[in-house]
Regions:
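Glycine/threonine-rich beta-strand-loop-alpha-helix active-site module
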Residues: 2-7, 11-100
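Short, well-ordered alpha-helices that flank and scaffold nucleotide-derived cofactor binding pockets
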Residues: 7, 34, 38, 181, ...
């Protein structure tokens, strides 16, 4: 589909891309700001020159991707039954605009999956060996905002999410800063084939592997940053750390 879009716009003269939508739309928008892309697959396999020649403005309508502050694009490659990622500075947006009202039309299920994606972005960004004190600040705050937001929704009902949508959208942005600099880990790596082959929504695919990966980390490096993460989550949800 992306290759067909490139064919359609090949002879159109434009100098700005405004991408408004969820993660997939934003990731495609980033690619449309590049010059002379003939094959998405070749682009993602670094077989084509990557040249940015258009202004890029990103406006997310979900609270999960953080794409407005990352240099990452993820696409499904059907011929290989998986997803591939491209991370280059040419994919950074010139401007990112956060408008909570645009997220309020999301169905509840889409909200859950997208916000879980942001939560996992922040968790993996924090646990990444490439994390820094800077990225940890954003990761910790994102985790706190998302989990405390979930608690409010549990207490006041699912429609209450729209009252605090700005909280989730900013948390997604913070998570984007965290993982955009520190990277993600095994949860995302394992989820790509699940999404690429079976079309499982990205947030749901990540969720399927989250606890198994965290338990593996705890078993193999129980004295690492997993302890700090456990303490943070326990303090937010008022649970004992051993739970």
């Amino acid at each position: 589909i992306i290759d067909e879009i490139f064919k359609d716009i090949k002879n159109i003269d434009f100098n700005r891309v405004i991408a408004i939508g969820g993660g997939s739309i934003l990731d495609v928008g980033k690619l449309l700001a590049l010059k002379d892309v003939s094959s998405t697959k070749k682009l993602f396999k670094r077989e084509l020159p990557i040249i940015r020649d258009k202004e890029l403005i990103i406006v997310p309508t979900t609270c999960g991707t953080g794409s407005e502050v990352t240099n990452i694009s993820i696409v499904e490659i059907k011929s290989e039954n998986t997803k591939l990622g491209l991370a280059v500075d040419e994919l950074y947006a010139d401007k990112g605009v956060l408008i909570p009202e645009l997220c309020k039309t999301m169905p509840y299920k889409a909200f859950v999956y997208s916000s879980i994606d942001a939560l996992i972005h922040s968790i993996e960004g924090f646990l990444s060996p490439n994390s820094t004190q800077y990225t940890d600040l954003f990761a910790f705050k994102a985790i706190e905002m998302i989990l405390s937001g979930y608690k409010e929704i549990l207490e006041k009902g699912e429609e209450y999410r729209n009252t605090i949508m700005d909280k989730f959208l900013i948390a997604s942005n913070y998570a984007g800063i965290a993982f955009g600099n520190a990277g993600v880990g095994a949860v995302h790596a394992l989820s790509y084939p699940l999404g690429g082959k079976y079309h499982v929504p990205h947030g749901e695919a990540n969720y399927q592997f989250l606890m198994a990966v965290l338990n593996f980390y705890k078993k193999n490096n129980g004295d690492g940053k997993i302890i700090e993460l456990t303490k943070l989550i326990s303090s937010i949800i008022n649970a004992k750390e051993e739970d």
